[in-house]
Amino acid sequence: MLTDVANGDSRISLWLRVREFAVPPSMIETATARRAVGDWAGACAAAGIDLDLDMRSLASGHGKELAARVRADLRHLAPDLLRWHMPRIAPDGLLRPGLTITLARYHAAGLDGPDPVHLVARTPPAWANAGQRIGLALWDGSRSGAGTRGHPHPRPSRRYRLDLHRHLWDARRAGELRIRSGSERPPGPRPPGWEEWGAPATERGCAVERWVEEAAIVLRAEGRSTGTVLVRCGTRRRFLMDLDLSPAPDLNLGLDLDLEPSPGSGAEAHTDFGNGSPAPRITAVSGDDGAFTSLPVLPDAATWVLPDLELIRAGAIDVGRLHPLVASALTPGQARSGPPEAPDPAGRPRIVECRGERHRIGLVGGALVALDHDPAELRREELLVELTGTPLPCLRAIDEAHRRPDCLSGVRERLDHGDIPGALAVVEGLLGPEAVLRDGPLRDELESAARRRIAYGLYRAGLADPSRGRVRADVGRRPPRHRRPRVATFF
């Protein structure tokens, strides 16, 4: 689900930052409250999801019955949960750009073409990823559709799909996460050749113990009882998994999966695994994906260990910091303590060593001021600074806070993940709502975030395409001096 990192500790550290900044508690609370009263559009807005849906056109083009099924799914869509589980890339844990991810497929008679209608989530290209917005649209394979203009990959991805993992976005199915993640089951028998390929893949975070069961779900969804499934585990690691599901193996999933097979495939609408045991054969292969285009692909969500499960097992996260639906699924019956309070609440005075004494700086009248100096003294000191004098340590601390505050890294992370209200709240909590920013890294970060939002607006309007030279190549990027070295490679 995430780009490779140098080692397991780096992976844990990276996912901790993602869980802290990518889906803030305020977003979860607002989206959940709106979904609870049936306002699915408002819930999407709260979760940073743009709607490219025209339900009237869907009903007129594909029938009221199909439109009703889509509406039912939208009413139970938990957009904050979807954002929580979206594929991400290192080093910052941002959304993987340029994806079209199928959430659900709908077959109906009279469609124009062989493809079913897909409910899809789209991430913008990398040059327009400011705000980390997600688009929600419909795709039927027979027309371009809304939200596809300027998108690098408008067709649904075979690897990044969630139609077989509804528990990652559908509130009705969220409880299935415990079973599908393998958190409650002991490791099963290991396939032949485990020491050669299985152990290294497991060390990299692959959920090898789950591959056979998840590959069986993929084959069942295509109405097949035997076949080969391609597994992509990292940048250049490929595995072929040969399965024979006749008679169907008893995989003990404990689920009644609602799968929509292709018309005429002969598969049942519900997958019910029978008795027997699979005899899978897994082999490592080389070559690019072009050599395996005819094979079904194991979804990325089934390839890797669930990040939240990995964090819990490592003792790196408290259950209260997880998404409520994730926490209730992975730790049923355990009380949630809620997010931890900030160690330095907004408005609390800070201590500064000033000329041999301990002075305070804090917020007064919406601005950061020196609390232990009288106004006349401060005016004299400010005048001396204008005449190239040395400012008081209290004034130096205030100036430094306006240019390069201690919270700068947290502000940057929030801006990168699109949490502008959270970033501004941190700044206002430190400097006050009436603060005037001075030249420095903090102001640069905020201005850069504003420029990147312009790039996203151009993308949404279909007015910019960097490949055609219609927008500056650096319009959506942070200035070079703020770039950080990569600690990982893309899948």
Where are these regions (language model features)?
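N-terminal membrane-targeting/anchoring modules of bacterial envelope and secretion proteins
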Residues: 1-212, 219-221, 430-490
